[in-house]
């Protein structure tokens, strides 16, 4: 498998990118990586490590697209940017997939415009995997499409179900529609119309509306939503988890000696919980519906996060998720 990696994407690039790749090669020696970015900077970082030289290829790219640039305009203007060159490696078939921790807008727009949509897919969607109390769940769409149509949400449900089934080995993943109430008549025009379509769709295991407070249980495998509500729910969930863990730490610091002894006994359990909520463990979010394996890593990804994004890309590839999505949408054409 060959993976293109945006060497200048993210707050900690290129050092974290190189660290993640070198670490991944120790485990996945069969893989080859194409890093895009200024050759001198990438080479300098690589010189710090001992690695198989035939497994890493540097593709020189002089420009970088920043997060404050207009995504589409930047893609058109900066043809020599690290993200554009990485996307073109997937488009021309040199690489099987791409990972970037750079500008989300530029990445999603580039995946759609350069790599291209799968035939039959109206709108690609971002589908991060999140930890739940009783299992992982996917939110789709988590921000790629602020405005959506009911038909788009049905497609999001299908792509999310295919991903979840093949990656987590769940034969019939459950799909819930993010809404303000469980009743069918609740919500706005979009959710009401989507509910009717999902209920009639026999290829989806639709379990009805799901309120945000029930998402963290993990009982529902896929939470489908427009990108605005999905992104809001995702960020609220991430922020709540971070603040709850922060409150626990604050209380521990203020605790008396006996309480601190109790906390020490609970330390292994607390570490496991904290690990579940660490974005580094999940690597990135798959962008479903484009004609390539596209993984969006967190902007502040470190070496560990990049390694796990590579692992996630490998799982996507080995479980034939892309081919399965193509097969589903070929039926409709």
Swiss-Prot record:
Q: Which domain of life is it from?
A: Bacteria
Which compartments does it reside in?
Cytoplasm
Its source organism is: Clostridium botulinum (strain Eklund 17B / Type B)
Protein encoded by which gene: plsX
Supply the name of the protein. Answer: Phosphate acyltransferase
PANTHER family registered for this protein in UniProt: FATTY ACID/PHOSPHOLIPID SYNTHESIS PROTEIN PLSX (PTHR30100), PHOSPHATE ACYLTRANSFERASE (PTHR30100:SF1)
Concerning InterPro entries, the annotation shows: FA_synthesis, Phospholipid_synth_PlsX-like
Keyword presence, Methyltransferase: no
Q: Name its GO BP terms in alphabetical order.
A: fatty acid biosynthetic process; phospholipid biosynthetic process
- Catalytic activity, as annotated: a fatty acyl-[ACP] + phosphate = an acyl phosphate + holo-[ACP]
What cellular component terms from Gene Ontology apply here?
cytoplasm
What EC identifiers does the entry list? 2.3.1.274
Question: What top-tier enzyme class does this entry carry?
Answer: transferase
The record's note on quaternary structure and interaction partners says:
Homodimer. Probably interacts with PlsY.
Keyword Chaperone applies: no
Q: What does this protein do?
A: Catalyzes the reversible formation of acyl-phosphate (acyl-PO(4)) from acyl-[acyl-carrier-protein] (acyl-ACP). This enzyme utilizes acyl-ACP as fatty acyl donor, but not acyl-CoA.
């Amino acid at each position: 498998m060959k993976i293109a990696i945006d060497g200048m994407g993210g707050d900690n690039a290129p050092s974290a990118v190189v660290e993640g790749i070198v670490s991944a090669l120790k485990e996945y020696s069969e893989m080859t990586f194409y890093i895009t970015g200024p050759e001198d900077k990438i080479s300098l970082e690589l010189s710090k490590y001992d690695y198989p030289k035939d497994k890493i290829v540097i593709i020189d790219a002089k420009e970088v697209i920043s997060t404050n640039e207009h995504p589409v305009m930047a893609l058109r203007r900066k043809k020599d940017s690290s993200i554009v060159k990485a996307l073109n490696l997937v488009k021309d078939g040199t690489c099987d997939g791409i990972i970037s921790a750079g500008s989300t807008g530029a990445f999603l727009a580039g995946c759609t415009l350069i790599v291209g949509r799968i035939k039959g897919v109206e709108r690609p969607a971002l589908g991060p995997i999140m930890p739940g109390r009783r299992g992982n769940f996917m939110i789709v769409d988590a921000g790629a499409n602020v405005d959506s149509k009911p038909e788009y949400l049905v497609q999001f449900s299908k792509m999310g179900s295919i991903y979840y089934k093949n990656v987590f080995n769940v034969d019939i993943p459950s799909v819930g529609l993010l809404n303000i109430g469980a009743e069918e008549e609740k919500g706005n025009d979009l959710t009401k119309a989507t509910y009717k379509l999902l209920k009639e769709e026999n290829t989806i295991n639709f379990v009805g509306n799901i309120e945000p407070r029930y998402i963290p249980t993990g009982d529902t495998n896929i939470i489908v939503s427009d990108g605005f509500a999905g992104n809001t729910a995702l960020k609220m969930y991430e922020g709540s988890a971070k603040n709850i863990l922060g409150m626990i730490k604050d209380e521990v610091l203020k605790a008396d000696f006996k309480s601190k002894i109790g906390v020490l006994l609970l330390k292994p359990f607390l570490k496991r919980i904290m690990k579940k909520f660490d974005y580094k463990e999940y690597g990135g979010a798959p962008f479903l519906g484009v004609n390539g394996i596209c993984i969006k890593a967190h902007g502040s990804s470190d070496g560990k996060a990049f390694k796990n994004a590579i692992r996630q890309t490998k799982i996507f590839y080995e479980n034939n998720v892309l081919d399965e999505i193509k097969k589903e949408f070929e039926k409709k054409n």
